[in-house]
C-alpha cells in the first residue's frame, strides 16, 4: 500500500501542520509497516510559478511553437498527477496563509486539474486526510469568523470535485505564545493543540483501515 503525503508549509522546521501530519503518518505506518510513503514538499520545493500556464497554453499551440519549457511543464503535470493517482491513501498538510490558499498549493491543484480534468474525479473514494492549521481564531463568534477562505475551498476541491473520502484535522491559535499580543490565548491554544493531536491520531488510525 502507498501513502501520498504533501506538505506545504514555508517553515518546514517549525511547521505546526507538518507536526500534525507526522502524527497521522505515524498511525498509518504502525498499521502498514511495509507500506511505502511518497512525499512531496511544496514549501521547500515549489512548483514553478509559470508551470500551469505553460502546460495549459501548450494545448492551444501548434507543435512547432511548443518549446522545451512547455514540455517540461507538461511532464511535471503528468508526474504530479501520477503521484496522486498511485496512492491508496492521501495526507495533505496545508496551513492557512493570508486568509486563503497558498499560491504554491493552488499551483499544485491547477497542475493536477490540467492532467486529470477530463478523466473523472482525481481521488474518487480514496481515503484522504487534510490537516490544516491557522495562526489565529476563525470560529463562530470570533472577530475573524468567515475570514478563513482556504478550508471551504479545499473541501470543495477535495471532497466535491475530486470526490475524496475526506477527513479534516484542524488546529487554531498556533501563533499564541509566539505573538505577544496573543499571550492571553495560550491556555486555550494548548487545549486546542491537545485536541488536534487526538484528532490526528484518530484520523491516522481510520486512514489505515479504509
What are these model-derived regions, one by one?
Residues 5, 92, 128-132, 168:
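Structural beta-sheet core signal
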Residues 35-37, 128, 166:
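Hydrophobic anchor at the start of a short beta-strand
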Residues 144-145, 154-210:
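Glycine-rich phosphate/pyrophosphate-binding loop and the adjoining helix
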Residues 48-54, 142-143, 179-182:
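Short aromatic-enriched loop/helix-cap "lid" or pocket-rim segments at secondary-structure transitions
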Residues 42, 133, 171-173:
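Active-site donor-binding loop signature of nucleotide-sugar glycosyltransferases
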Residues 9-11, 135-138, 174-176:
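A short, flexible beta-alpha/helix-coil linker loop
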Residues 1-94, 99-114, 198-210:
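N-terminal beta1-alpha1-beta2 submodule of the flavodoxin-like/Rossmannoid cofactor-binding fold
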Residues 118-163:
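Short, glycine-/small-residue-rich phosphate/pyrophosphate-handling segment
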